[in-house]
Design a protein with these regions (language model features):
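Sigma70-family region 2
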Residues: 11-12, 51-65, 87
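Short, charged helix-capping/linker segments at alpha-helix termini
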Residues: 11-19, 30-49
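Structural recognition of an alpha-helix C-terminal capping motif at a helix-to-coil junction
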Residues: 31, 45-52, 66-78
């Protein structure tokens, strides 16, 4: 299925299109997140958060500005940064 039509379906609220996109990108995104944070279970949780955020914010995606994968990575980087800030804060409280 062509990505353009999947994105349109996703913007229209089609859960099947979302599922297809999720299956298409989840492993690649999981590898990216794991590379950044070096924790497998946390990476899996963050990937879920990323896809939730993408689902909620799909209306902000503009195909003329970037690829969908770059949109995913942009959301991933925001979630990873938030995760890192929380981790640093937790580590400082423990010390």
């Amino acid at each position: 299925m062509e990505e353009h039509s999947l994105i349109k379906g996703l913007k229209d609220g089609d859960n099947e299109d979302f599922r297809y996109i999720y299956e298409k990108y989840k492993e690649k995104l999981n590898s990216y997140v794991y590379y950044k944070i070096k924790n497998k279970s946390e990476a899996e949780d963050l990937v879920q958060e990323i896809f939730t955020k993408v689902y909620k914010n799909i209306g902000l995606y503009d195909e003329t500005q970037s690829t969908f994968y770059n949109f995913l990575l942009s959301n991933a980087n925001q979630i990873i940064a938030e995760y890192s800030r929380k981790n640093i804060s937790r580590e400082q409280k423990v010390e």
